[in-house]
Protein backbone atom coordinates (compact mmCIF):
# COMPACT_ATOMS: atom_id res chain seq x y z
CA UNK A 1 0.00 0.00 0.00
CA UNK A 2 1.35 3.42 -0.94
CA UNK A 3 2.24 5.53 2.07
CA UNK A 4 0.75 9.02 1.73
CA UNK A 5 1.20 11.69 4.37
CA UNK A 6 -2.28 13.20 4.66
CA UNK A 7 -2.01 14.83 8.10
CA UNK A 8 -1.54 18.29 6.61
CA UNK A 9 -3.87 17.87 3.62
CA UNK A 10 -6.35 20.76 3.53
CA UNK A 11 -9.70 20.93 1.71
CA UNK A 12 -11.65 24.02 0.74
CA UNK A 13 -15.44 24.26 0.74
CA UNK A 14 -15.29 24.12 -3.06
CA UNK A 15 -13.38 20.84 -2.91
CA UNK A 16 -15.85 19.34 -0.44
CA UNK A 17 -18.59 20.18 -2.93
CA UNK A 18 -16.61 18.95 -5.95
CA UNK A 19 -15.92 15.53 -4.42
CA UNK A 20 -19.20 15.16 -2.50
CA UNK A 21 -20.18 11.98 -4.40
CA UNK A 22 -16.87 10.41 -3.37
CA UNK A 23 -17.10 11.52 0.24
CA UNK A 24 -20.37 9.67 0.84
CA UNK A 25 -18.91 6.37 -0.41
CA UNK A 26 -17.86 4.24 2.59
CA UNK A 27 -14.88 2.96 0.60
CA UNK A 28 -13.53 6.49 0.00
CA UNK A 29 -14.79 9.16 2.43
CA UNK A 30 -12.49 12.03 3.38
CA UNK A 31 -9.49 9.81 4.14
CA UNK A 32 -9.58 8.26 0.68
CA UNK A 33 -10.06 11.61 -1.02
CA UNK A 34 -7.06 12.96 0.87
CA UNK A 35 -5.00 10.04 -0.44
CA UNK A 36 -6.10 10.85 -3.98
CA UNK A 37 -5.02 14.46 -3.50
CA UNK A 38 -1.56 13.39 -2.33
CA UNK A 39 -1.06 10.90 -5.19
CA UNK A 40 1.21 11.57 -8.16
CA UNK A 41 0.42 9.80 -11.44
CA UNK A 42 2.46 9.91 -14.66
CA UNK A 43 0.96 9.16 -18.08
CA UNK A 44 3.27 7.78 -20.74
CA UNK A 45 1.50 9.13 -23.81
CA UNK A 46 -1.46 11.47 -24.23
CA UNK A 47 -3.14 9.54 -27.04
CA UNK A 48 -6.04 7.10 -27.15
CA UNK A 49 -5.31 5.36 -23.85
CA UNK A 50 -4.06 8.45 -22.06
CA UNK A 51 -6.98 10.71 -23.00
CA UNK A 52 -9.73 9.11 -20.87
CA UNK A 53 -7.39 8.31 -17.99
CA UNK A 54 -6.01 11.83 -17.81
CA UNK A 55 -9.40 13.50 -17.69
CA UNK A 56 -11.00 11.00 -15.29
CA UNK A 57 -8.12 11.06 -12.81
CA UNK A 58 -8.10 14.85 -12.88
CA UNK A 59 -11.84 14.81 -12.17
CA UNK A 60 -11.38 12.21 -9.41
CA UNK A 61 -9.01 14.51 -7.53
CA UNK A 62 -5.55 13.09 -8.20
CA UNK A 63 -3.36 15.88 -6.86
CA UNK A 64 -0.47 15.74 -9.32
CA UNK A 65 -0.52 14.51 -12.92
CA UNK A 66 2.48 14.28 -15.23
CA UNK A 67 2.23 13.70 -18.98
CA UNK A 68 5.06 12.79 -21.33
CA UNK A 69 4.49 12.94 -25.10
CA UNK A 70 6.27 14.69 -27.96
CA UNK A 71 3.44 14.35 -30.48
CA UNK A 72 1.36 16.99 -32.25
CA UNK A 73 -2.43 16.65 -32.60
CA UNK A 74 -3.51 15.39 -36.02
CA UNK A 75 -6.96 15.09 -37.59
CA UNK A 76 -6.69 11.28 -37.56
CA UNK A 77 -6.32 11.37 -33.75
CA UNK A 78 -9.80 12.75 -33.17
CA UNK A 79 -11.53 9.43 -33.87
CA UNK A 80 -10.32 8.05 -30.52
CA UNK A 81 -8.34 10.70 -28.60
CA UNK A 82 -11.23 12.43 -26.87
CA UNK A 83 -9.19 15.13 -25.14
CA UNK A 84 -8.82 17.04 -28.39
CA UNK A 85 -11.00 19.06 -30.77
CA UNK A 86 -10.65 20.30 -34.34
CA UNK A 87 -9.23 23.64 -33.25
CA UNK A 88 -6.47 21.79 -31.34
CA UNK A 89 -4.98 20.31 -34.53
CA UNK A 90 -1.34 21.27 -34.96
CA UNK A 91 -0.74 21.94 -31.27
CA UNK A 92 1.25 19.92 -28.74
CA UNK A 93 -0.75 17.12 -27.13
CA UNK A 94 0.72 17.69 -23.68
CA UNK A 95 0.03 21.43 -23.73
CA UNK A 96 -3.59 20.96 -24.79
CA UNK A 97 -4.01 18.13 -22.26
CA UNK A 98 -2.71 20.40 -19.50
CA UNK A 99 -5.19 23.12 -20.47
CA UNK A 100 -8.08 20.63 -20.45
CA UNK A 101 -7.10 19.35 -17.00
CA UNK A 102 -6.88 22.83 -15.50
CA UNK A 103 -10.19 23.83 -17.10
CA UNK A 104 -11.77 20.86 -15.35
CA UNK A 105 -9.88 20.93 -12.05
CA UNK A 106 -7.71 23.99 -11.31
CA UNK A 107 -6.45 22.42 -8.07
CA UNK A 108 -4.59 19.68 -9.97
CA UNK A 109 -0.83 20.18 -10.33
CA UNK A 110 0.06 19.38 -13.96
CA UNK A 111 3.59 18.88 -15.26
CA UNK A 112 4.21 18.18 -18.94
CA UNK A 113 7.27 16.74 -20.63
CA UNK A 114 7.29 17.55 -24.34
CA UNK A 115 9.62 14.70 -25.22
CA UNK A 116 9.77 10.94 -25.68
CA UNK A 117 10.60 8.65 -22.80
CA UNK A 118 14.22 7.62 -23.29
CA UNK A 119 17.02 5.82 -21.53
CA UNK A 120 18.52 9.24 -20.73
CA UNK A 121 15.42 10.81 -19.11
CA UNK A 122 13.38 7.89 -17.76
CA UNK A 123 14.92 7.77 -14.29
CA UNK A 124 14.66 11.52 -13.67
CA UNK A 125 11.04 11.74 -14.83
CA UNK A 126 9.59 8.55 -13.39
CA UNK A 127 11.18 8.91 -9.94
CA UNK A 128 8.86 11.90 -9.30
CA UNK A 129 5.64 9.82 -9.44
CA UNK A 130 3.93 7.03 -7.49
CA UNK A 131 2.07 5.30 -10.32
CA UNK A 132 2.97 5.13 -14.01
CA UNK A 133 0.19 4.57 -16.56
CA UNK A 134 1.42 3.15 -19.85
CA UNK A 135 -0.31 4.52 -22.93
CA UNK A 136 2.55 3.76 -25.31
CA UNK A 137 2.18 1.72 -28.49
CA UNK A 138 5.68 0.35 -29.07
CA UNK A 139 7.87 -2.29 -27.47
CA UNK A 140 10.93 -0.07 -26.94
CA UNK A 141 8.98 2.24 -24.63
CA UNK A 142 7.24 -0.63 -22.84
CA UNK A 143 10.49 -2.41 -22.01
CA UNK A 144 12.20 0.81 -20.95
CA UNK A 145 9.20 1.64 -18.76
CA UNK A 146 9.25 -1.86 -17.27
CA UNK A 147 12.93 -1.64 -16.40
CA UNK A 148 12.75 1.88 -14.99
CA UNK A 149 9.75 1.02 -12.81
CA UNK A 150 11.59 -2.07 -11.60
CA UNK A 151 14.70 -0.05 -10.80
CA UNK A 152 12.74 2.65 -8.93
CA UNK A 153 10.09 0.33 -7.43
CA UNK A 154 7.24 2.14 -9.17
CA UNK A 155 3.83 0.70 -9.99
CA UNK A 156 3.30 0.19 -13.73
CA UNK A 157 -0.27 0.06 -15.09
CA UNK A 158 -0.20 -1.51 -18.55
CA UNK A 159 -2.75 -1.08 -21.31
CA UNK A 160 -2.75 -2.11 -24.95
CA UNK A 161 -5.26 -2.05 -27.79
CA UNK A 162 -5.47 -3.65 -31.22
CA UNK A 163 -8.42 -3.37 -33.60
CA UNK A 164 -11.31 -4.61 -31.41
CA UNK A 165 -9.39 -6.00 -28.43
CA UNK A 166 -7.70 -4.54 -25.37
CA UNK A 167 -5.59 -5.65 -22.40
CA UNK A 168 -4.99 -4.23 -18.92
CA UNK A 169 -2.71 -5.33 -16.08
CA UNK A 170 -0.80 -3.93 -13.11
CA UNK A 171 2.91 -4.72 -13.08
CA UNK A 172 5.59 -4.44 -10.38
CA UNK A 173 2.97 -4.25 -7.64
CA UNK A 174 4.06 -5.56 -4.23
CA UNK A 175 6.54 -8.01 -5.72
CA UNK A 176 4.17 -9.20 -8.45
CA UNK A 177 4.97 -9.92 -12.11
CA UNK A 178 6.45 -7.31 -14.44
CA UNK A 179 5.88 -6.67 -18.14
CA UNK A 180 8.81 -8.89 -19.13
CA UNK A 181 7.09 -11.80 -17.37
CA UNK A 182 4.11 -11.33 -19.67
CA UNK A 183 5.93 -10.53 -22.89
CA UNK A 184 9.59 -11.35 -22.48
CA UNK A 185 10.75 -11.22 -26.09
CA UNK A 186 12.19 -7.99 -27.42
CA UNK A 187 10.61 -6.05 -30.23
CA UNK A 188 10.38 -7.91 -33.52
CA UNK A 189 9.65 -6.44 -36.89
CA UNK A 190 6.49 -8.43 -37.46
CA UNK A 191 4.80 -7.40 -34.20
CA UNK A 192 6.09 -3.84 -34.20
CA UNK A 193 4.36 -2.95 -37.44
CA UNK A 194 0.89 -3.71 -36.02
CA UNK A 195 -0.16 -0.51 -34.22
CA UNK A 196 -3.25 1.69 -34.37
CA UNK A 197 -1.67 3.77 -37.12
CA UNK A 198 -1.52 0.92 -39.63
CA UNK A 199 -3.83 -1.84 -38.37
CA UNK A 200 -6.71 0.29 -37.12
CA UNK A 201 -8.63 0.37 -33.87
CA UNK A 202 -12.26 0.84 -32.90
CA UNK A 203 -12.47 4.42 -31.65
CA UNK A 204 -14.40 3.46 -28.52
CA UNK A 205 -11.90 0.80 -27.42
CA UNK A 206 -9.15 3.03 -25.96
CA UNK A 207 -11.84 4.79 -23.93
CA UNK A 208 -12.74 1.51 -22.26
CA UNK A 209 -9.17 0.31 -21.72
CA UNK A 210 -7.86 3.71 -20.64
CA UNK A 211 -10.67 4.06 -18.12
CA UNK A 212 -9.90 0.60 -16.73
CA UNK A 213 -6.27 1.68 -16.27
CA UNK A 214 -7.41 4.81 -14.43
CA UNK A 215 -9.71 2.71 -12.24
CA UNK A 216 -6.79 0.50 -11.20
CA UNK A 217 -4.81 3.63 -10.30
CA UNK A 218 -7.61 4.89 -8.03
CA UNK A 219 -7.95 1.47 -6.37
CA UNK A 220 -4.22 1.33 -5.70
CA UNK A 221 -4.17 4.83 -4.20
CA UNK A 222 -7.13 3.97 -1.97
CA UNK A 223 -5.44 0.78 -0.81
CA UNK A 224 -7.87 -1.79 -2.21
CA UNK A 225 -6.59 -5.37 -2.20
CA UNK A 226 -8.23 -6.58 -5.42
CA UNK A 227 -5.75 -5.27 -8.00
CA UNK A 228 -4.98 -6.65 -11.48
CA UNK A 229 -1.53 -7.77 -10.40
CA UNK A 230 -0.51 -11.19 -11.71
CA UNK A 231 -3.49 -11.10 -14.06
CA UNK A 232 -4.13 -9.85 -17.58
CA UNK A 233 -7.68 -8.61 -18.16
CA UNK A 234 -8.69 -8.83 -21.81
CA UNK A 235 -11.69 -7.22 -23.48
CA UNK A 236 -13.20 -8.12 -26.85
CA UNK A 237 -15.55 -5.40 -28.06
CA UNK A 238 -17.06 -7.58 -30.80
CA UNK A 239 -18.26 -10.20 -28.33
CA UNK A 240 -18.62 -7.83 -25.34
CA UNK A 241 -16.58 -10.30 -23.31
CA UNK A 242 -13.97 -9.96 -20.58
CA UNK A 243 -11.48 -12.68 -19.67
CA UNK A 244 -8.72 -12.97 -17.08
CA UNK A 245 -5.45 -14.87 -17.45
CA UNK A 246 -2.77 -15.49 -14.86
CA UNK A 247 0.81 -14.31 -15.40
CA UNK A 248 3.69 -16.38 -14.10
CA UNK A 249 6.10 -14.34 -11.96
CA UNK A 250 9.60 -15.22 -13.22
CA UNK A 251 11.27 -12.93 -10.66
CA UNK A 252 12.91 -11.01 -13.50
CA UNK A 253 15.60 -8.71 -12.14
CA UNK A 254 18.04 -6.18 -13.52
CA UNK A 255 21.29 -6.50 -11.62
CA UNK A 256 22.43 -2.94 -12.26
CA UNK A 257 21.44 -0.01 -14.45
CA UNK A 258 24.48 -0.53 -16.66
CA UNK A 259 22.97 -3.85 -17.77
CA UNK A 260 19.78 -2.26 -19.14
CA UNK A 261 21.07 -1.74 -22.66
CA UNK A 262 21.57 -5.43 -23.30
CA UNK A 263 17.80 -5.90 -22.97
CA UNK A 264 16.93 -3.39 -25.70
CA UNK A 265 17.10 -4.97 -29.12
CA UNK A 266 18.53 -8.24 -27.83
CA UNK A 267 16.82 -11.52 -27.20
CA UNK A 268 15.92 -12.30 -23.60
CA UNK A 269 14.88 -15.64 -22.22
CA UNK A 270 11.32 -16.83 -22.74
CA UNK A 271 9.20 -19.78 -21.66
CA UNK A 272 7.50 -20.00 -25.05
CA UNK A 273 9.44 -21.02 -28.14
CA UNK A 274 8.69 -18.84 -31.15
CA UNK A 275 8.98 -18.85 -34.91
CA UNK A 276 8.63 -16.11 -37.52
CA UNK A 277 6.14 -16.48 -40.35
CA UNK A 278 9.01 -16.82 -42.82
CA UNK A 279 10.50 -19.67 -40.79
CA UNK A 280 7.07 -21.26 -40.49
CA UNK A 281 6.53 -21.10 -44.25
CA UNK A 282 9.84 -22.87 -44.85
CA UNK A 283 8.90 -25.56 -42.33
CA UNK A 284 5.49 -26.12 -43.92
CA UNK A 285 6.93 -26.33 -47.42
CA UNK A 286 9.32 -29.04 -46.21
CA UNK A 287 6.20 -31.26 -45.84
CA UNK A 288 7.18 -32.47 -42.38
CA UNK A 289 4.15 -34.52 -41.28
CA UNK A 290 4.78 -34.16 -37.53
CA UNK A 291 3.09 -30.80 -37.00
CA UNK A 292 -0.29 -29.15 -36.59
CA UNK A 293 -1.37 -25.52 -37.04
CA UNK A 294 -3.59 -24.24 -34.21
CA UNK A 295 -5.66 -21.08 -34.70
CA UNK A 296 -6.83 -19.75 -31.30
CA UNK A 297 -9.11 -16.99 -32.61
CA UNK A 298 -12.88 -17.31 -32.32
CA UNK A 299 -14.95 -19.28 -34.84
CA UNK A 300 -16.18 -16.17 -36.68
CA UNK A 301 -12.64 -14.90 -37.27
CA UNK A 302 -11.47 -18.36 -38.30
CA UNK A 303 -14.20 -18.80 -40.91
CA UNK A 304 -13.42 -15.41 -42.46
CA UNK A 305 -9.77 -16.34 -43.08
CA UNK A 306 -7.21 -18.79 -41.75
CA UNK A 307 -4.09 -20.69 -42.73
CA UNK A 308 -4.94 -23.74 -44.83
CA UNK A 309 -5.08 -27.01 -42.84
CA UNK A 310 -5.17 -25.22 -39.47
CA UNK A 311 -7.24 -26.44 -36.52
CA UNK A 312 -9.50 -23.93 -34.74
CA UNK A 313 -9.24 -24.09 -30.92
CA UNK A 314 -10.71 -20.77 -29.67
CA UNK A 315 -8.88 -19.32 -26.67
CA UNK A 316 -12.05 -18.83 -24.65
CA UNK A 317 -12.78 -22.58 -24.89
CA UNK A 318 -9.29 -23.99 -24.79
CA UNK A 319 -9.13 -24.56 -21.02
CA UNK A 320 -12.16 -26.82 -20.98
CA UNK A 321 -11.17 -28.97 -23.95
CA UNK A 322 -10.20 -32.61 -23.98
CA UNK A 323 -7.24 -32.95 -26.34
CA UNK A 324 -7.02 -36.74 -26.39
CA UNK A 325 -9.08 -37.11 -29.58
CA UNK A 326 -6.95 -34.59 -31.51
CA UNK A 327 -3.65 -36.44 -31.09
CA UNK A 328 -1.42 -33.46 -30.31
CA UNK A 329 1.06 -35.27 -28.08
CA UNK A 330 3.56 -36.34 -30.75
CA UNK A 331 3.34 -33.25 -32.93
CA UNK A 332 4.87 -29.79 -33.08
CA UNK A 333 1.96 -27.43 -32.45
CA UNK A 334 2.29 -24.05 -34.16
CA UNK A 335 -0.05 -21.63 -32.36
CA UNK A 336 -1.24 -18.36 -33.90
CA UNK A 337 -3.93 -15.68 -33.52
CA UNK A 338 -4.48 -12.32 -35.24
CA UNK A 339 -1.32 -10.80 -33.79
CA UNK A 340 0.23 -11.96 -30.51
CA UNK A 341 -1.87 -11.58 -27.37
CA UNK A 342 -4.15 -14.62 -27.57
CA UNK A 343 -1.41 -16.90 -28.88
CA UNK A 344 0.75 -15.97 -25.87
CA UNK A 345 -1.98 -16.97 -23.41
CA UNK A 346 -2.85 -20.13 -25.35
CA UNK A 347 0.79 -21.20 -25.73
CA UNK A 348 1.51 -20.89 -22.01
CA UNK A 349 -1.60 -22.88 -21.15
CA UNK A 350 -0.89 -25.62 -23.71
CA UNK A 351 2.74 -25.89 -22.59
CA UNK A 352 1.40 -26.59 -19.10
CA UNK A 353 -0.50 -29.51 -20.69
CA UNK A 354 2.89 -30.98 -21.74
CA UNK A 355 2.37 -30.21 -25.43
CA UNK A 356 5.17 -29.28 -27.85
CA UNK A 357 4.22 -25.66 -28.55
CA UNK A 358 5.82 -23.09 -30.86
CA UNK A 359 4.16 -19.67 -31.08
CA UNK A 360 3.94 -17.85 -34.43
CA UNK A 361 5.13 -14.27 -33.90
CA UNK A 362 2.86 -11.64 -35.39
CA UNK A 363 0.14 -14.18 -36.14
CA UNK A 364 -2.12 -14.10 -39.16
CA UNK A 365 -1.54 -10.38 -39.69
CA UNK A 366 2.20 -10.92 -40.08
CA UNK A 367 1.55 -13.81 -42.49
CA UNK A 368 -0.72 -11.63 -44.64
CA UNK A 369 1.74 -8.72 -44.60
CA UNK A 370 4.89 -10.73 -45.29
CA UNK A 371 3.83 -13.96 -47.06
CA UNK A 372 0.47 -12.99 -48.49
CA UNK A 373 -1.35 -16.11 -49.67
CA UNK A 374 -3.00 -18.10 -46.87
CA UNK A 375 -2.80 -21.28 -48.95
CA UNK A 376 0.84 -22.14 -48.36
CA UNK A 377 0.45 -25.41 -50.32
CA UNK A 378 0.43 -23.56 -53.64
Swiss-Prot record:
**Alphabetical list of Gene3D superfamilies matching this protein:** NAD(P)-binding Rossmann-like Domain (3.40.50.720), Rhodanese-like domain (3.40.250.10)
Write down a Pfam family by its short name. Rhodanese
Which residues are in the Rhodanese domain? Answer: 287-376
The family classification in the record reads: Belongs to the HesA/MoeB/ThiF family.
Organism, by scientific name, is: Pyropia yezoensis (Susabi-nori)
Q: Which GO terms describe its molecular function?
A: ATP binding; molybdopterin-synthase adenylyltransferase activity; sulfotransferase activity; thiosulfate-cyanide sulfurtransferase activity; ubiquitin-like modifier activating enzyme activity
What does this protein do, in the record's words? Answer: Catalyzes the adenylation by ATP of the carboxyl group of the C-terminal glycine of sulfur carrier protein moaD.
**E.C. designation(s):** 2.7.7.80
Give me the residues that bind ATP, please. 48, 69, 76-80, 93, 137-138
Pathway listed for it is: Cofactor biosynthesis; molybdopterin biosynthesis
According to its UniProt record, this protein's enzyme class is: transferase
Give the record's keywords alphabetically.
Answer: ATP-binding, Chloroplast, Molybdenum cofactor biosynthesis, Nucleotide-binding, Nucleotidyltransferase, Plastid, Transferase
**Could you confirm whether the keyword Coiled coil appears in this record?**
no
What name does the UniProt record give this protein?
Answer: Probable molybdopterin-synthase adenylyltransferase
Q: Does the keyword Transit peptide apply?
A: no
